């Protein structure tokens, strides 16, 4: 799908919103939909992240997948609020001079054109701050979990050799880094699941 087609995708999204209570969300009336411990998620948050996620993930919203994508957006927002609490508790910050680098990395790692994504968001009057919140949370969470778990991980030569057999284009160091990142991600996912299990989540 081209980026011009993604602009048309937003028209589909807007139709979906019109047929849903989410369509009523705007910057003057934010209805609280979910409480996550002491954090809130409003209908406006859900509407904005629903649209932005569909753009980033290159998904065409239909009557068949709309409800599923809505639930995924809600679950992602719950996870994001839990992540933000931990990020604040550990005082993880992204330095201003590093923010552009991390933002560019976010788009490049997903093979997305940053300028075109920004233009689509602007043309369709979506909230760019919602995208920036997602990016900053993702980057800060990665920094936090690396700090928490990196020192607990040990990669064996056998694991490295096995990966190199499957892909001989990798260097020894790159193979080790890939395996390390995978282990950090697994521990990060479990950490988030544990936080969610302990959280007080109230849907209104």
Question: Predicted regions span which residues?
Answer:
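Short, conserved catalytic-motif segment at the N-terminal edge
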Residues: 53-65
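Glycine-centered signal
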Residues: 1-2, 20
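Sec/Tat signal peptide C-region and signal peptidase I cleavage site
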Residues: 21-25
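Peptidyl-prolyl cis-trans isomerase
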Residues: 27-31, 35, 40-41, 64-204
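Bacterial N-terminal signal peptides that target proteins for export
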Residues: 2-10
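A short acidic/small-residue loop/turn micro-motif
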Residues: 48-50
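Bacterial N-terminal signal peptides
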Residues: 10-19
């Amino acid at each position: 799908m081209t980026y011009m087609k993604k602009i048309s995708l937003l028209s589909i999204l807007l139709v979906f919103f019109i047929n849903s209570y989410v369509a009523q969300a705007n910057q003057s009336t934010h209805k609280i939909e979910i409480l996550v411990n002491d954090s809130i998620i409003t209908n406006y948050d859900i509407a904005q992240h629903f649209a932005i996620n569909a753009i980033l993930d290159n998904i065409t919203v239909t009557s068949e997948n709309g409800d599923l994508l809505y639930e995924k957006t809600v679950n992602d927002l719950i996870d994001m609020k839990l992540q933000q609490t931990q990020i604040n508790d550990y005082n993880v910050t992204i330095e201003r001079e590093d923010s552009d680098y991390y933002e560019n990395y976010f788009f490049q790692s997903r093979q997305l054109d940053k300028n075109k994504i920004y233009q689509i968001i602007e043309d369709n009057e979506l909230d760019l701050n919602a995208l920036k919140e997602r990016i900053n949370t993702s980057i800060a969470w990665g920094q936090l979990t690396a700090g928490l778990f990196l020192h607990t991980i040990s990669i064996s030569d056998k694991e490295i050799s096995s990966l190199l057999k499957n892909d001989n284009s990798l260097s020894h160091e790159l193979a080790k880094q890939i395996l390390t990142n995978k282990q950090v991600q697994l521990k990060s996912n479990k950490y988030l699941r544990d936080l969610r299990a302990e959280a007080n989540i109230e849907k209104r």
